[in-house]
Amino acid sequence: WDRALITAYMASFGVIVSATIGITVGSLCAQNRLATKIILLVCDTFQTFPSFVYLIPVMILFGVTDTSVLIAVIVYATIPATRYTVEGLRSVPESLQDAGSMSGVNRLQRWIKIEMPLAFPHIMLGINQTVIFALFMVIIGAFIGTEDLGQFIIKALSDKQGIGNGLLLGLCVAAIGLAVDHLIQTWANERKRVLGLP
């Protein structure tokens, strides 16, 4: 149980920080076509790397600690949040943006009242992906010695008699992911209803 809480804590912290960074960077880059192309290229490039690659530089800089894993989680999980935020904001029809500008709203008001609500479904899809990426990287982080469910999973998989334990631990990780996904979906659906989105 304590290992499950550590896993949930590390994944949750990673998701919160990754989502904050991803939505901020995505919102800024979506305002400019060149910045959009550059950030999407960066996201595509980072997604081609194997997940273990993210652990190497942080291990060199910070050593074999939970901090290293958290930094790797944040870097890895920021990618979908950034990508889906950019794509969501770029998908807002220009006619609605022009209508907002003609109504006298400034850029910040247009972003808050028009662009973000319409991009909301895309952004929440990105947050869901961020949760999955964060959980995945936390489990991978067990290879460098984190004290979470991932370590038990690795031990179970290396033991011929540990198949049942490995399956049970895998289900625990899946349950954490499903619980977070359900919470996000419930909140997202409520926000859609409030904003009048389909």
For each of these PLM feature ranges, what is it?
Residues 1, 13-43:
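Transmembrane-helix boundary motif in ABC transporter permease subunits
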Residues 4, 8, 38-45, 85, ...:
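Hydrophobic alpha-helical elements at and bordering transmembrane segments
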Residues 10-14, 18, 22, 26, ...:
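Alpha-helical transmembrane segments in multi-pass membrane proteins
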Residues 23, 27, 37, 41, ...:
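Membrane-spanning helices that line or support transport/gating and their immediate boundary helices
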Residues 43-77:
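Generic hydrophobic transmembrane alpha-helix motif, especially the helices
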Residues 75, 107-141, 164, 168, ...:
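Transmembrane alpha-helices
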Residues 80-123:
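Short cytoplasmic-facing helical segments at TM-TM junctions of multi-pass membrane proteins
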Residues 143-195:
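Interhelical loop and adjacent transmembrane-helix boundary motif
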